[in-house]
Amino acid sequence: MDKDQIKKELADKSNEILTKYGEPDVVEEVSVMNMSSKTVFLGSLKVFNYEIVPNLIKDLNKQLKGYGELVVRDQRVTPCCSPSYIHISFNVTINN
């Protein structure tokens, strides 16, 4: 398993999906947690248009599920001094 290649592909696919829906956020890097029996790739996206969230999550599931066990979560964030947004996070778990 080439972890650097998977990290790059996950970030690229996430950015393609954000671009498809006209979102300004960019996924610069996907984090990696190495464990003895598995490797977990962690990424997050910031989405300002609430209406596209269900379709964006569907696209994420479709694009990323082939890498391993995929979990996608979303949470509304309301900062004090900037526009509110939906934080979408994903983990892809690959058994070693």
Segments (PLM) and residue ranges:
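Short, hydrophobic/π-rich interface segment
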Residues: V40-S82
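Residues marking helix boundaries in flexible regions
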Residues: K7, L18, V27, V53, ...
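Hydrophobic alpha-helical membrane-spanning segments
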Residues: K13-E23, D59-L64, C80-C81, I86-I88
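C-terminal edge-of-domain segments
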Residues: D74-N96
